[in-house]
Amino acid sequence: MFIRNNRRSKIVATVGPASSSPDMLRSLFLAGVDTFRLNFSHGARADHAEVYRNIRALEQEHDAAIAVLQDLQGPKIRIGVLAHGRLDLARGSTIGFILGREGGEGMNDIPLPHREIFEVAVPGMDLLIDDGRIKVRIMEVMDGRLVCEVLNGGALSNRKGVNVPGAVLDISPLTAKDREDLEFGLELGVDWVALSFVQRARDMIEARSLVGDRAGLIAKIEKPSALDDIEDIVRLSDSVMVARGDLGVEIPPEDVPGKQKEIIRACRLAAKPVIVATQMLDSMVSSPTPTRAEASDVAGAIYDGADAVMLSAETATGAYPVEAVEIMNRIIEKTEKHKHYRPILEATEPDVAQSPPHAVATAAANVAVALGSPVVVAYTSSGTTAARISRARPALPILALTPSEQVARRLNMFWGVVGVRSQDVHTYEASLIHAQQAVQEAKLASPSDHIVIVAGFPFAQQGSTNNLRVVQIAATDNLEIA
């Protein structure tokens, strides 16, 4: 049984050309990766399937639960093909967006094949092009034409991306390609599905109707309108990703750190794991060491209470994928050992509405710390019990025992949780004995240690966390389930 017990926060790494071989996947896993991300914006399905199979082989090799995250591309809002392939936009000049895929009659006409933008356009609205590098303001709205003033100019080429900050577009977050990719991923057996271009809570309902309970559903927060609807989006999702790249284009950069903290707090309140992503160690795409600002960025997300931090290009296409994971692993370790880490986590603990399951989970964390227990054991069929304990952020690992292999994998996204597939137990006495065996096999506790065991009775009833027991571990030879 492979157990990672050097830190509580988790690492997500994106697989790409630099990291897709079996040997590289193994190196990344041993360096600290907890979840592998398959980015369906790039690569063929056959390539993703091969990577998936290699991850599952790695899982068997190390007797570990490894999660696989499928990240769907989502709709891409782009300009069309310019009449001359390039347009130099000068600040203060006037341009026109025309509805269509190819350039119009005027030299400064830019094709925009997205009627939904024309439907919401109003004078004074800003459009951002090429990741925000070019900024224009709508001056006049005509039938099939938007007359704009260039605020920030530059050279524009074909099919550059367009962002419409502050507007909610009448567009589904799932394209035809996404729906096909989603079904492919679910058939493959992915554990998490990340939904791009989430604008409002109802987008999650549409996705849930397709995913069901076959995978955990992650809402990527990259639109300002999603921030306005964040509580309902968190409620309807299983996890949230703070996608700071697109979000940082659509809101002022100075607003991103505060919004990151708000999203993390909302997720912790709901006991849902939150991933902080984008450009965390971006310089390591081409450099063997990160900038000091990047190291501080990773540490800041850990201090904020993030469940996981994510590497994108660093591991997908970078020259130093293993080094990026190793450094991120060390940053997390150092941060979690810092004298200010625990006080900050405790000061930001959310005020949760009391219920018996929440009270038991919180008590388990507190009792374990008070007794100096090395581990909390959580029996869970759906993952809810372990998630509730994780929300309390106890200073010790949470060993989640579940009969479901997929639940075990998903739980490894949660702060402090070690998900392990275990035998199904049906009696109270059997649960106590099996917990003692499991913590010793995982090398998380030794004979004579006191451990805290949390479960719900009757067994296999989702959300029924109602029992807490402190047990002193007996020697393995003296443990036997009748």
From Swiss-Prot:
Homotetramer. The record marks K220 as: Transition state stabilizer. Substrate binds at R37, G245, D246, T278. Pathway: Carbohydrate degradation; glycolysis; pyruvate from D-glyceraldehyde 3-phosphate: step 5/5. InterPro entries: Pyr_Knase, Pyrv/PenolPyrv_kinase-like_dom, Pyrv_kinase-like_dom_sf, Pyrv_Knase-like_insert_dom_sf, Pyrv_Knase_AS, Pyrv_Knase_brl, Pyrv_Knase_C, Pyrv_Knase_C_sf. It is an enzyme of class 2 (transferase). Its cofactor is Mg(2+); K(+). The keyword ATP-binding applies. This is Pyruvate kinase. It comes from the Bacteria. Mg(2+) binds at E222, D246. Induction: By tartrate. It catalyses: pyruvate + ATP = phosphoenolpyruvate + ADP + H(+). Belongs to the pyruvate kinase family. Its EC number is 2.7.1.40. NCBIfam families: PRK05826.1 (NF004491), PRK06354.1 (NF004978), pyruv_kin (TIGR01064). PROSITE patterns: PYRUVATE_KINASE (PS00110). Keywords: ATP-binding, Glycolysis, Kinase, Magnesium, Metal-binding, Nucleotide-binding, Plasmid, Potassium, Pyruvate, Transferase. Coiled coil: none annotated. The gene is ttuE. ATP binds at N39, F40, S41, H42, R78, K160. One of its GO terms (molecular function) is magnesium ion binding. K(+) binds at N39, S41, D71.
